Design a protein with these regions (language model features):
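Loop-rich non-cytosolic ectodomains and luminal regions
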Residues: 1-196
Length: 196
């Protein structure tokens, strides 16, 4: 199956430069987030906390991991960078938020170069709902490209759900395409109020 992340507000897609707003609920101990870019672009980010603390612009061209400490918000963000991820062949920035202050966090995504070399497109994902203890969502999410692994693999037949009673898409069902433009899901099947 394609998963149930279509309506969970856990995917964001845009071109840089842009600001990504993330709503973090009360009592969240921590969460992870991934930014997947596309070559040949280089990515830089700055993160603003709900209390207004702003990190310096972090440039990842050198491939060095970084940690940000927010003194007033008492939050730590660890950033690990993979310049070229071995399976996908694209840059990946992995962010781990520990003890995040509730409210709206803003991630400013820009190019580390004066002139972008590619199209500047990037995707960000939060964990699937079952991996989060509290709510974390993008304020301007994209319901597209929300298929869960391994349904993105080209050798896998991916099935998503629709509501056969209304002939409409099941809103929670993961949607394609894949991040690199592959056509998924392969099939849709009734997925709402199906008798046992």
């Amino acid at each position: 199956g394609g998963g149930n992340e279509g309506d969970k507000e856990h995917h964001y897609e845009h071109s840089m430069p842009s600001d990504v707003e993330i709503r973090v609920s009360e009592r969240m101990k921590g969460f992870c987030m991934e930014l997947w870019g596309s070559l040949p672009d280089d990515y830089a980010i700055s993160i603003r906390s709900p209390g207004g603390e702003v990190s310096p612009v972090l440039d990842f061209r050198n491939g060095i991991d970084k940690t940000i400490y927010y003194i007033f918000d008492r939050t730590r963000i660890t950033l690990a960078v993979v310049l070229v991820e071995k399976d996908a062949g694209d840059p990946l920035i992995f962010m781990r938020f520990d003890n995040p202050t509730p409210g709206i966090w803003t991630v400013a995504v820009s190019s580390s170069e004066r002139q972008m070399r590619g199209n500047g497109l990037y995707h960000m994902w939060l964990p699937i709902e079952q991996f989060l203890e509290q709510s974390v969502t993008f304020l301007s999410p994209s319901p597209e490209v929300t298929l869960t692994e391994p349904s993105n693999a080209s050798q896998v037949i991916t099935i998503s759900g629709y509501d056969s009673h209304t002939d409409s898409w099941y809103s929670a069902s993961g949607r394609g395409y894949t991040r690199n433009g592959g056509i998924k899901p392969d099939l849709v099947a009734p997925g709402v109020r199906v008798p046992a």
